[in-house]
Regions:
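Extended alpha-helical scaffold segments
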Residues: 1-107
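Short, charged, low-complexity loops and linkers
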Residues: 28-39, 82-91, 114-118, 280-290, ...
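Alpha-helical solenoid scaffolds in eukaryotic proteins
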Residues: 28-36, 43, 84-88, 92, ...
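Extended alpha-helical "rod" scaffolds
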Residues: 42-56, 60, 64, 94-96, ...
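Extended, low-charge, aliphatic-rich alpha-helical segments
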Residues: 81-85, 89, 104-187
Length: 433
C-alpha cells in the first residue's frame, strides 16, 4: 500500500472532488491522478484482493480441519482470524479499491461525454458505446474482486452516473430552441439538422437497450460469484435501480419523439383540413369517380412521406416505428373528429371504408408494428356507415361481435348511425345496445 502510495492517492482523489458523482463538474478538465495510471493500480489491487480471498478461504478451511483440537476452538479461531491484522489489511485495500474504481469510472465516463462525436456509418454518437464499455469494464472488475461491498459500491456509482451526467448529456441537444424551424428551413427537410435530432433519439433508444443488457450480464455473473442469499438480495436491489434507468431513458426518448412529431404535424395539417371539405353524401357516379380520382387519401400519404419518411434512414428501426405511430395517432384523432361532423350516404360509408383500407395498407408498409389497432375506431365507423339498415348493427354487436372488439361506446355507435342521411332517428333511439 505504501509502495503504491494508496493512502495519498485516495486522499488526492477525495480532495479533488468530495463527491465523485457531482453533476456540476461534468466535462471540466481538472488536475488530479492520471486515470490510466489508476487503472494499472486497480489491476494490481484486484490481484491482491483475489489472493487475499484465496488465502482467507485456505486458512479458514485449515482451521476447520483441525479435528484433534477442542471443537469449540475452531469457531473462535476462525473469528479471530477474520478480525485479525490480515483481514484488516484486506479491508483497507478494499476501501482504496472502491475509491480508485469510482474515480476511474467517473473520469472516463466524463471524458466519453466530453469528446462525444459523430461516428461514420453509425446511428449513434461515440459516447454511447464508450460510456457503457467503461461501466461494463468497471463492474466486471468489481465482481472479480469477489467482494460484495465493492460490487455494491461500483453498481451504485454506475447508476448515479447514468441518472445524472449521462442522462443530462443525452437530453442536451433536444433542449435547443427553434428546433422545428431548423428542421424544415426553407420549407424542406434539412439533412444535417435531421441527422442531429435523429442521432440524439437513437442515443436514447440504444442506451435504454444497453442498460438492460448490462443489468442482465451483471446479474448472471453475480449469481455465479455470490451464492449467499443475503449477497444476492443486495445485488438485486442495486440492479433494480440500474434497470430503472432503462425506463428513464425511454421516457426521455418518448418526450423527444413527441417533440419531433410536433415539428412535422403542422406541415401535414393543411392536407387534413382539406378533408373537412370533402363530401361523403355520394351518388353512384361520384363514388365511381372517387375510385379513379382519389379525393384526399393519396394527398395525405404524400404529405406524410415528404415530411417524415426521409428520416427513416437516420433513425433506429424502433425509433422510426414509434415516430410513425405517433404521426398516425395525430392523423386518426383528427380524422375521427372530421368524420363525426359529416353526413354520409351508404356509398359514403363504403368510401370511408375504402379510405381506411388505403391508409392501413400504406402505413403497414411504413412500419414493422401493426397499425390496424390505431385505425380500429375509424374502421368501425365505416362498418356502421355501410349498413343496409339500422337494425343490422345488432348482427355485429354484443354476442354477435365475434373476434371483433368494439372500440366505440354504445352512445358513439348511435351517434355514428345518426350521420347516415337515410337512417331514421326513431329507429336509432329504439336500438338496445
Amino acid at each position: 500500500m505504501e509502495y503504491r502510495r494508496l493512502p495519498k492517492l485516495s486522499s488526492e482523489i477525495n480532495a479533488q472532488n468530495m463527491n465523485l458523482l457531482d453533476v456540476g463538474v461534468a466535462g471540466v478538465g481538472s488536475e488530479g491522478p492520471d486515470p490510466r495510471e489508476v487503472e494499472l493500480i486497480l489491476e494490481e489491487i484486484l490481484s491482491l484482493m483475489q489472493l487475499g480471498e484465496d488465502y482467507t478461504e485456505f486458512m479458514v478451511s485449515k482451521i476447520k480441519g483441525l479435528s484433534n483440537v477442542d471443537p469449540d476452538l475452531a469457531p473462535r479461531a476462525t473469528k479471530s482470524f477474520r478480525s485479525g491484522s490480515f483481514s484488516k489489511v484486506v479491508q483497507d485495500i478494499t476501501g482504496f479499491y472502491v475509491i480508485l474504481e469510482g474515480f476511474f469510472m467517473v473520469e472516463n465516463v466524463r471524458k466519453a461525454i466530453r469528446i462525444d462525436e459523430h461516428v461514420p456509418d453509425s446511428l449513434t454518437t461515440s459516447m454511447v458505446d464508450d460510456v457503457f464499455y467503461v461501466l461494463q469494464s468497471c463492474l466486471r472488475r468489481a465482481i472479480s474482486t469477489l467482494n460484495i461491498s465493492s460490487v455494491i459500491a461500483v453498481l451504485s456509482g454506475a447508476s448515479s452516473l447514468l441518472s445524472n451526467e449521462y442522462h443530462e448529456a443525452l437530453q442536451h441537444k433536444m433542449r435547443e430552441p427553434n428546433l422545428g424551424a431548423k428542421l424544415f428551413l426553407g420549407g424542406v427537410g434539412v439533412q444535417k439538422t435531421g441527422t442531429e435530432i435523429a442521432t440524439v433519439l437513437n442515443n436514447m433508444d440504444v442506451s435504454s437497450e444497453y442498460v438492460l443488457k448490462l443489468k442482465h450480464e451483471i446479474e448472471e455473473q453475480c449469481l455465479e460469484v455470490f451464492p449467499a442469499p443475503a449477497d444476492r438480495e443486495k445485488v438485486k436491489s442495486c440492479l433494480s435501480e440500474l434497470g430503472d434507468m432503462s425506463i428513464t431513458f425511454k421516457q426521455a426518448l418518448n418526450a423527444g419523439l413527441e417533440q419531433l412529431v410536433a415539428t412535422v404535424t403542422p406541415r401535414i395539417r393543411p392536407v387534413l383540413d382539406n378533408v373537412a371539405t370533402i363530401s361523403y353524401e355520394l351518388s353512384e357516379a361520384e363514388y365511381a369517380d372517387n375510385e379513379v380520382n382519389d379525393p384526399w387519401v393519396q394527398g395525405l400519404l404524400h404529405a406524410v412521406e415528404t415530411n417524415a419518411a426521409w428520416l427513416q434512414s437516420l433513425m433506429t428501426a424502433n425509433n422510426y416505428d414509434s415516430f410513425i405511430h405517433l404521426i398516425i395517432e395525430f392523423l386518426v384523432k383528427r380524422l375521427e373528429v372530421i368524420m363525426m361532423q359529416k353526413r354520409f350516404s351508404q356509398l359514403g360509408g363504403l368510401q370511408l371504408d375504402r379510405d381506411c383500407r388505403a391508409l392501413v395498407s400504406h402505413f403497414s408498409s411504413m412500419t414493422q408494428r401493426t397499425v390496424r389497432d390505431k385505425f380500429a375506431r375509424l374502421t368501425q365507423m365505416a362498418t356502421i356507415l355501410n349498413l343496409e339498415k339500422v337494425s343490422e348493427i345488432l348482427d355485429f354487436w354484443g354476442e354477435n361481435s365475434g373476434p371483433m372488439t368494439w372500440r366505440l361506446t354504445p352512445a358513439e355507435v348511435r351517434r355514428v348511425l345518426g350521420l347516415r342521411v337515410d337512417f331514421k332517428s326513431e329507429a336509432i333511439a329504439a336500438l338496445k345496445l
